[in-house]
């Protein structure tokens, strides 16, 4: 059988924020180890070592990885087969369940929107709190595993709708990672939201950044690069 590829997703976002992180740090990206966390209704986390992605949480499809708004994230394949047999679901029905009715929505029983779940958890809804706790647990698990995979880390980047706007998710995630040297500045963290870029660590250990993604800008630059390259090749052929 042909091997199945690991595509990964949000590649344009991860490339943009990792490059931007190197710029604001004043360092060559080829000398840095960065974990980029694109957190939104769909989420993925990537290990960028010396400018190259060496691992990413999403795989063949966007279903893999940490728990998301309506997606399960990583799940035991046998659990899928068990549910299909027990409930008599077709492959299409199972795909719909895993992709559109699970994740934060399925656990909370309320919504896939982080803002709704945040309010419900604050009001004492146990399922909403569980959904947020599961989300935080899985984010920190990926950060920890990628830090180990790269033999260390120089910076963490949060981006995406939740990554840029949820000070709570950032704080609770980093609070469980002090053994890696992370030291979050809570005051700085609480001031960054709604598209604001900034550094939120206390100045010791690996840096922690919030960097708004610009996928359209990155695509425009990549397109410009390709057009320039094609133009040079055409001119060389004419000459």
Sequence positions of predicted segments:
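Adenine-nucleotide phosphate-binding core of ATP-dependent small-molecule kinases
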Residues: 96, 103-107, 114-149
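Internal helix-turn-beta structural module
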Residues: 129, 133-157, 163-235
